Amino acid sequence: MKKITALMLSSAMMLSLAACGGSASTDAVSSEAVSSEAASSEAVSTAEAAPAALTTVTAGKLTMSTNAAFPPYEMTTDSGEFEGIDIDVAAAIAEKLGLELQVDDMDFDAALLAAQNGKSDIVMAGVTVTDERLKVMDFSDTYAEGIQSIIVPEDSDIASADDLTGKAIGTQRGTTGYIYCTDDFGEDNVIAYDDGLTAVQALNNGQVDAVVIDNAPAQEFVEANPGLKILDTAYAQEDYAIGVAKGNTQLLDAINGALEELKADGTLQAIVDKYINAE
């Protein structure tokens, strides 16, 4: 503003000393100065509004740790590629953030620890928010809902969760299914496997009486294994979220912003519908 005032005073002095022919030149100088200051001010404002670049494990990439044996959320194709709800959601988030998605496949427990210890940026593997997990990592807004289901042989006498008392229960190691079952039925009755498929194979072989796992993969496993069924009564209901290292608010805020956009424009629902048929 001081520059503009000085220029106006200068213009007034020039008008008093010169003929009318000097007026156009003075107006041009004044207009140029105002435009210059406005552009400078706009540049400063834009710089202040621009978000800081995200710091990730690998520059330019969003590294996701997962356990790719959890269909339809994460799985491996015949060609060795990763696909599934979580994979597609993570890819859409990465695109929103201007990053390239990198998927690291490992055991479920290791996937959680990778995000917790900053070895990966995020963990997505049908991860449920629990009080214990909140102590060691932060979570995004919910992006999907899950149900813990019980798989049994078609001729089983197990009709509900109440009938699991004293039975051998197969679960996936480190999952909420494992946590819930050990809390409800004791560790001696719960057998943890590296993935859901191995637990279902144990059920087929008569090594366990039932398997407790998320409903979406449960449906996939039952469809692929004639002679098994899912009980009508759900064991537990829960929400899935994206885990990040404790205190990484910059990344968490960016992820939540991307999720909000994906929900608003219908992308998130389209991804879910791609893998899970609406009933």
What is each residue range found by the language model?
Residues 91, 95, 100-163, 229, ...:
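Acidic, polar ligand-binding/catalytic clefts
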Residues 49-54, 176-193, 226-234, 259-279:
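Ligand-binding clefts/hinges and TM-proximal coupling segments of bilobed small-molecule sensing domains
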Residues 49-126:
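Extracytoplasmic small-molecule ligand-binding "clamshell" domains
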Residues 127-135, 180-182, 204, 209-237:
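A ligand-binding cleft/hinge motif common to bilobed small-molecule-binding domains
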Residues 17-34:
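Bacterial lipoprotein signal-peptidase II cleavage site
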Residues 87-88, 102-114, 156, 173-176, ...:
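Short helix-initiation/N-cap motifs at beta->coil->alpha
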Residues 68, 144-152, 215, 219-260, ...:
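Periplasmic-binding protein-like
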Residues 87-96, 155, 168, 173-175, ...:
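Extended ligand-binding regions for polar small-molecule ligands
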